[in-house]
Swiss-Prot record:
Pathway: Cell wall biogenesis; peptidoglycan biosynthesis. Pfam families: Dala_Dala_lig_C, Dala_Dala_lig_N. This is D-alanine--D-alanine ligase. Its EC number is 6.3.2.4. Its main location: cytoplasm. Residues 103-302 form the ATP-grasp domain.
Amino acid sequence: MTALQHVAVLMGGWSSEREVSLRSGAACAAALERKGYRVTRIDVQRDIATVLQNLKPDVALVMLHGKPGEDGTIQGVLETLGIPYSHSGVLSSSLAMRKDLAKTVMATAGVPVAEGLTLTRAEIAKAHVMAPPYVIKPVADGSSVGVFIVTEDQAHPPQELFRDDWPHGEELLVEKYIAGRELTCAVIKGEASDVIEIVPLLKFYDYEAKYSKGASKHVLPAPVLPFVYQEVRRLTLAAHGALGCRGVSRADFRYDDRIEGTGGLVCLEVNTQPGMTETSLVPELAGYAGVAFDELVQWMVEDASLDR
């Protein structure tokens, strides 16, 4: 890629993660402009195919979180229009977005995942479908949106499940709650990054903790035993490969350090479109490895292709 190329930064959209996407996109667009690229910022709406067809950018930097940018939809549009793009392709994006299906694929590849069930909202709302504590989460949302932790002292599932305006879809994933620490590792330039521990200053690492300054503490490198550290890195690459991810991805883990060896490690999910805001983990991990934010964004553009 040359500095004269025209990059369309795709952001916004209509998912529950719209605001985070706008922040990620704005940060990346500014970085590319500092590098000399011609940049067009696009707040993605339903007419995106027409907008791109008229604009004819050389490459698309996808900074969409949730649908339609993280589930394979926008990737299909870009493939059809012949516009090289960043991050993962159609199949891996749609697969990773469906947490239940992604877990099946990762487990087959030897990546440990949480015990869980995929059920309808009505089934889950009736009564406990497994012994508490357990976690209820949308099968295809990110940023911890719509996540509920059901504890032992709760006699019934969350009453929010009965809402007429429930926004998170009718299929939900119910998983056994995994006690322990939050660890995260990324794949950047084909290699596993260092490992970071997230210590929420709230009750758990929810949307507010992820995107509000001072709402969580990041410890880098994560203070775990060396063999655990390396196992997180190995599993991150294994999950990335099993799902067919490309470009940058991020794997999130729970680690119960009361269990001997690495038996307490569980992969919660792989994010094919990690956040790029001022509080996001991937820029922090890249920076720790000596890759500045602007260089990371430029690499994402240089890595763009139609072979995803």
